[in-house]
Amino acid sequence: MKNMLRDAAILFAITVIAGAVLGFVYDVTKEPIAQQEARAKQEACQEVFADASAFETVAEAGDASYGAILEAGYDKASIEEVMKAQSSAGDVLGYVMIVTSHDGYNGDIRFSMGIRMDGTLNGISLLAISETPGLGMRAEEVLKPQFAEKQASVFAYTKTGAASEDQIDAISGATITTNAVVEAVNAGLCYFQNVLEGGVEQ
């Protein structure tokens, strides 16, 4: 009986100490992690809107306005955040969106996209992707450049060579990845056309 009580006391002490250590580690690392995430987001915004001086969040995860893309049929994509891209004078140059496709071949594909007020897509910046090496992972080199400085209301991918502004050359052997990215970009464009141009307070 005495041994059982001793073992229980030792186990309790270990649990308390472990909990205290974990709590301490969390407190120590929480701020640096938050700062790192903030820097990563800033860099992602700056990459798709290089001439903007500031970014102001106008819609966060779970915002009711995101229902617009579901109504349009984009149920395999979600918008995590929408930010106004502003000049040094405070003028709104356009918007940056953080978008996630849930239709990748090997998981979610997350990226930022910047759109000017005239509807021009500055481009996209891939934030998270884990597709097949040599195939879907080529999205960075094959797909990303094709979205730069394009003006289209909706994109479509082709396997025979892009012949117009709204066509994107598919990654050879990775049409699932291609479709996932294209449809998620289209979801962002849909949100811009149906919600942002419709009067987000500027």
Tell me what each language-model feature is.
Residues 2-202:
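Flexible, solvent-exposed loop/hinge segments and secondary-structure transition points
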